[in-house]
Amino acid sequence: EETIHRGRFLRIQRASFVAPDGERFERDIVRHPGAVAVVPVTAAGGVLLVRQYRPAVDRWLLEIPAGTCDVEGEPHETTARRELAEEVGCAAEALVPLIRMANTPGFCDEWTSIFLATGLSPVAHDRHGAEEVHLEVVEVPLERFDALVDDGTIVDAQTVLGVALARRHLPPAG
């Protein structure tokens, strides 16, 4: 593999492969350290989302709290708890693993671990960096979530998947 670009936390490598029929081919692969995402559900039955600007799509998105696994060797649960505190100012009594998913396996090796967080309580937090400073926390009632997906307000795939999987662990609404 040849590294053709090295960024802050991403690398792009050109790799050679041999197909089952023996044909050789190359692919550019984005190397990513992985990420975590958290579905924080309040006692009132809402999910805490963050509204933040995403330069890659030039749009403000509503997403579950998430972040890169940027501390080598740190357990994903620890990273998830840190992101929950940093982005929405909460600690979780319970953190339940929902899925470890391959985000875009056609060109990237990133895996994201998604957790359900319940038993939320406020904690002091310090947002840092341009993206986190401008976050807005929005509580969306779970019964409104699907309508926000349907109307294109929520478009982030890990948010849609995370909430869908979290619902399996929550009591029925009503």
Task: Locate the predicted segments by residue.
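Nudix hydrolase/Nudix homology domain
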Residues: 23, 60, 97, 101, ...
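Active-site segment of metal-dependent pyrophosphate-handling enzymes
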Residues: 11, 33-34, 54, 63-66, ...
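Conserved Nudix-box catalytic region and its N-terminal flanking loop in Nudix hydrolases
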Residues: 37-82, 99, 124, 131-132
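Short, well-ordered beta-strand micro-motif
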Residues: 14-16, 40, 116-118, 139-141
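Local beta-strand/beta-hairpin segments that build beta-sheet-rich folds
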Residues: 2-5, 98
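Acidic, metal-coordinating catalytic segment for phosphate/diphosphate chemistry
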Residues: 4-44
